[in-house]
Amino acid sequence: MRAVILAAGLGTRFKSEKPKVLHEILGKPMLWYVITNVRNGRIDDIAVVVGHKAQEVMEAFKNENLKFFIQENPKGGTADAVLAAKDFFSSYEGYVLIINGDSPLVSGETIRNMQQFIHMVRTYEGIKLGGVVLTTHLPDPTGYGRIIKEEGTDRIIRIVEEKDATPEEKAITEINAGTYIFYAPYLLEALYRIKPSPVTGELYLTDVIEYMVNKGYEVRSFMAKEPTEALGVNTRWDLALVENVIKLKIARYWAERGVTVHYPETVWIEPDVSIEPDVEIFPDVMLKGKTKIKKGSVIGKGSVIKDSLVEENVIVREYSVIENSEIKKRAVVGPFARIRNESVIGEEAEIGNFVEVKKSSIGKGVKAKHLAYIGDATVGENTNIGAGTVFANYDGKRKYESYVGKSAFIGSNSLLIAPIRVGDWAYIAGGSVVNKDIPEGALAVSRPELKIFEGRGKKKLQKD
């Protein structure tokens, strides 16, 4: 089996400079989903027909082992787009899947089932089908082509478009989902014989079906497992609706594998994310990129985790952001914490509210619970970092590193000016500005002398 994906459309209703098939759904281009579903349908020999901004599309998928064909006239119609890829199947004796690049909901399972249906008809009825059309029933079929069949069978007579349908035909709820499998020699024959529409000048794939039926090449319908598979993406609102369907499918996939997802309509889980059983995910969470969440962890409301590893039994409290970092076992992050740039938070460490950690290694059992900035630093195990502590790592030209040993104490509102080393068991008194290395076990105090002037405060407050 081979596949041709049609991705040449102008996408004018998107009102965008970007090709429609490159608009993203859960962090992936729309076309990625179609390619992935085709491959999940056990088809690896794939051609993509491009047209509008062809180079952008080809560049985006240059590493996907695809064959590209260019439709010279993007307004030539769907059959003209398939004809642009004729060299891909002109000498091929098998079947070809034709699917739109804006149909990301047609599942790999459905594609496999369509192939199996062709095989069963050949095996049990002795009929080599000319084609199979994916269909579904919609309660409101307005705008879709209606499937006209022989009564009591799945044999298609023709597909009639909404504008051409009689009142009786408009009452039909079975519609064309826009995905087809054709026997390649019959397809090629039909493509060369059909005529352009006298109204638009376009060549339509639905005319291929009518041609095959008239030639005696049997075409049958195959019902999609879910009506949503018929949803194409023609507008930004369609994109939002399709994204919501995929979002819920992904949430359900993980729920069926032992993950608790609260209020799944609000949870964003991208396709490359991996989650182990007994993870609990609260509303408004975003899990992005190649994030991995290990068993027993809890991800609090509104948190965003991208391209990061969260190990076992971690608690990420509300509205925390973690990017390109690792959170080790039993650590606690947040609420309102930010961890980024390849930081590592050690086992049982606590990074609390309004603490930012950037490109730093935080040891086991470290506590930084409030209002701190830790940048370009290594902090040894069991060290305490008080509220308001800042690691000053930038002098206006370059970044410098800091090292704090194990079991040290950094008092509240301390300023550590890098490059600097603070030894094990060192104690820095609150409010200190530290610009020299502190030896192991030493006490460092850096404060201006406090002066008290009796009675002066009241005088100032009462002054007119």
From Swiss-Prot:
Keyword Lipid biosynthesis: no
Chain segments carrying region Pyrophosphorylase: 1-236
UniProt region (N-acetyltransferase), positions on chain: 258-464
Record's function text: Catalyzes the last two sequential reactions in the de novo biosynthetic pathway for UDP-N-acetylglucosamine (UDP-GlcNAc). The C-terminal domain catalyzes the transfer of acetyl group from acetyl coenzyme A to glucosamine-1-phosphate (GlcN-1-P) to produce N-acetylglucosamine-1-phosphate (GlcNAc-1-P), which is converted into UDP-GlcNAc by the transfer of uridine 5-monophosphate (from uridine 5-triphosphate), a reaction catalyzed by the N-terminal domain.
EC number: 2.7.7.23, 2.3.1.157
Regions that span the bilayer: none
Catalytic activity: alpha-D-glucosamine 1-phosphate + acetyl-CoA = N-acetyl-alpha-D-glucosamine 1-phosphate + CoA + H(+); N-acetyl-alpha-D-glucosamine 1-phosphate + UTP + H(+) = UDP-N-acetyl-alpha-D-glucosamine + diphosphate
Name of protein: Bifunctional protein GlmU
SUPFAM superfamilies given in the database record: Nucleotide-diphospho-sugar transferases (SSF53448), Trimeric LpxA-like enzymes (SSF51161)
Pathway: Nucleotide-sugar biosynthesis; UDP-N-acetyl-alpha-D-glucosamine biosynthesis; N-acetyl-alpha-D-glucosamine 1-phosphate from alpha-D-glucosamine 6-phosphate (route II): step 2/2; Nucleotide-sugar biosynthesis; UDP-N-acetyl-alpha-D-glucosamine biosynthesis; UDP-N-acetyl-alpha-D-glucosamine from N-acetyl-alpha-D-glucosamine 1-phosphate: step 1/1; Bacterial outer membrane biogenesis; LPS lipid A biosynthesis
InterPro entries per the UniProt record, alphabetical: Bifunctional_GlmU, GlmU-like, GlmU_C_LbH, Hexapep_transf_CS, NTP_transferase_dom, Nucleotide-diphossugar_trans, Trimer_LpxA-like_sf
Lineage of origin: Bacteria, Pseudomonadati, Aquificota, Aquificia, Aquificales
MF annotations from Gene Ontology: glucosamine-1-phosphate N-acetyltransferase activity; magnesium ion binding; UDP-N-acetylglucosamine diphosphorylase activity
Chain positions covered by the region annotation Linker: 237-257
Amino-acid positions noted as binding acetyl-CoA in the UniProt annotation, renumbered to this chain: 387, 393-394, 412, 430, 447
Cofactor binding remark: Binds 1 Mg(2+) ion per subunit.
Binding residue positions for Mg(2+): 102, 234
Superkingdom of the organism of origin: Bacteria
Active site: 370
Subcellular localization, as worded in the UniProt entry: Cytoplasm
UniProt organism field: Aquifex aeolicus (strain VF5)
The UniProt record lists the keyword Acyltransferase: yes
Cellular component terms (Gene Ontology): cytoplasm; membrane
Amino-acid positions noted as binding UDP-N-acetyl-alpha-D-glucosamine in the UniProt annotation, renumbered to this chain: 6-9, 20, 77-78, 145, 161, 176, 234, 340, 358, 373, 384
Assembly with partners or alone: Homotrimer.
Cofactor(s) in the UniProt record: Mg(2+)
Family per similarity comment: In the N-terminal section; belongs to the N-acetylglucosamine-1-phosphate uridyltransferase family. In the C-terminal section; belongs to the transferase hexapeptide repeat family.
Major location (coarse): cytoplasm
